[in-house]
Amino acid sequence: ILDSNEEKEALINRTSTQKKLSPYYVNAKPDDIWRPITERIQPPVEFWLKCFMNAQFIITDSFHACVFSILFHKEFVVVGNQKRGLSRMKELLQDFRMEDRLIDEANISDFDISSLHLIDYTLVDKILNERRRYSLNWLMNSLNDKNE
């Protein structure tokens, strides 16, 4: 969670109770000068990625955490974060047919995690592979046009 607040913490607590999981936070608090120094240092990227790899469920408000949740085939929800690029998050989730994973911050207290279905990562991978092929073709065509 990049921009923590009481509603997001309540969602994390509700979800961890329902799923019988213990919340684990990866992000540091660099701006909180009253925190111990160990809580203010950002973890290495490798550690951050390992946490995604090992997570059973992810709650985030970060676009990049949403992307890594998809790449690591994780069950997740993302709280819409107006300050952090909500439109790109909506577009990403629409592209992969995961609109139900987006929680409107205004309705966060009404969100019921048990209403979610498991993500069909076979479909997601198919879409992702199509996007990769398209991107690679575009790149190769662009490079070939420059060489002629």
Locate each region found by the language model.
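Active-site anion-handling motifs in enzyme catalytic cores
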Residues: I1-E148
